[in-house]
């Protein structure tokens, strides 16, 4: 009697045959727990027609048992049913593939779809694996777009529908955690510069003068070098390269030696010219 009572109580307890997607780091971001996922693929196998019906519900939060094929186990999270029909006759079920919650589950995010791999389902003496891809398509309730067997034990299925889309708040995130697709957070760094500050901080006047003097020095050096080369070549154009080199070295040495005195004379003339013009502004009484 106690055994029968315990069995009855256990049968009344709810069981969880799927994954709690809300606690899964990846599945929690997708709408996979909001929709029933299923599809049918039909293949001509003359004289018969082969049909594969697929059903998926990996989230415990969504109850889609009403859409599960009759041949599948109520504890399945993924199930496939193969049936064959001859013209004018009822279809015959030839294969039922049950993937219960005991199979290994691997979830990945790819650029094209949400990838779900189920492996280790027992089918007679064989082991079956399923690679399922959920692509995002906002409109409609979803459909099976691709179904293929890579070998006798591995099937690949591609579903397209809203279940493959990210939930609001998980797509188009920017660096501030909002959905406005920009990195502005309202602080002073986001304010546009005024018209006078478009180029940032302006360089000081001394920096502009220094740059001008550097360019002037570079041009003067280039012109002096050209002058020395041309003059040395003109004086030794009928001689050898050694003659040209000696002439160039001598002229360069002389130029470098006389340059300070030349610069001093130029500076003196500039200063004297300024003083003379200043004195010219006074008249004798």
UniProtKB/Swiss-Prot annotation:
Tell me if rRNA-binding is a UniProt keyword of this record: no
Q: Which UniProt keywords apply?
A: Autophagy, Cytoplasmic vesicle, Disulfide bond, Glycoprotein, Golgi apparatus, Membrane, Mitochondrion, Protein transport, Signal, Transmembrane, Transmembrane helix, Transport
- Look up and give the membrane topology term: Single-pass type I membrane protein; Single-pass membrane protein
What are the start and end residues of every segment in region (Disordered)?
168-204
Residue intervals annotated with topology Lumenal: 19-209
Q: Where in the cell is it found?
A: Cytoplasmic vesicle membrane; Golgi apparatus membrane; Mitochondrion membrane; Preautophagosomal structure membrane
GO biological process, alphabetically ordered: autophagy; protein transport
- In Swiss-Prot or TrEMBL terms, this protein is called Autophagy-related protein 27
Q: Which organism is it from?
A: Kluyveromyces lactis (strain ATCC 8585 / CBS 2359 / DSM 70799 / NBRC 1267 / NRRL Y-1140 / WM37)
Organism lineage string: Eukaryota, Fungi, Dikarya, Ascomycota, Saccharomycotina
Q: Which gene encodes it?
A: ATG27
């Amino acid at each position: 009697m106690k055994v029968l009572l315990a069995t009855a109580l256990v049968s009344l307890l709810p069981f969880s045959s799927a994954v709690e997607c809300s606690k899964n780091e990846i599945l929690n971001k997708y709408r996979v727990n909001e929709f029933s996922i299923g599809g049918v693929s039909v293949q001509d196998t003359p004289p018969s027609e082969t049909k594969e019906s697929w059903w998926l519900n990996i989230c415990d939060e969504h109850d889609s048992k009403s859409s599960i094929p009759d041949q599948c186990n109520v504890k399945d999270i993924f199930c496939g049913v193969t049936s064959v029909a001859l013209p004018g006759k009822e279809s015959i079920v030839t294969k039922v593939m049950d993937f219960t919650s005991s199979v290994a589950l691997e979830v990945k995010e790819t650029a094209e779809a949400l990838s779900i791999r189920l492996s280790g389902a027992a089918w007679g003496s064989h082991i079956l694996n399923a690679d399922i891809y959920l692509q995002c398509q906002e409109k409609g309730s979803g459909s099976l777009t691709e179904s293929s067997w890579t070998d006798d034990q591995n099937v690949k299925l591609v579903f397209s529908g809203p279940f493959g889309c990210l939930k609001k708040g998980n797509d188009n995130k920017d660096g501030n955690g909002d959905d406005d697709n920009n990195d502005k957070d309202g602080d002073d760094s986001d304010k546009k510069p005024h018209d006078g500050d478009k180029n940032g901080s302006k360089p000081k006047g001394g920096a502009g003068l220094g740059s001008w003097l550097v360019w002037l020095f570079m041009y003067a050096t280039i012109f002096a070098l050209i002058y020395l080369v041309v003059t040395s070549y003109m004086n030794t154009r009928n001689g050898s390269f050694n003659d040209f080199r000696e002439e160039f070295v001598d002229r360069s040495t002389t130029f470098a030696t006389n340059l300070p005195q030349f610069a001093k004379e130029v500076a003196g003339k500039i200063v004297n010219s300024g003083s003379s013009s200043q004195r010219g502004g006074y008249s004798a009484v």
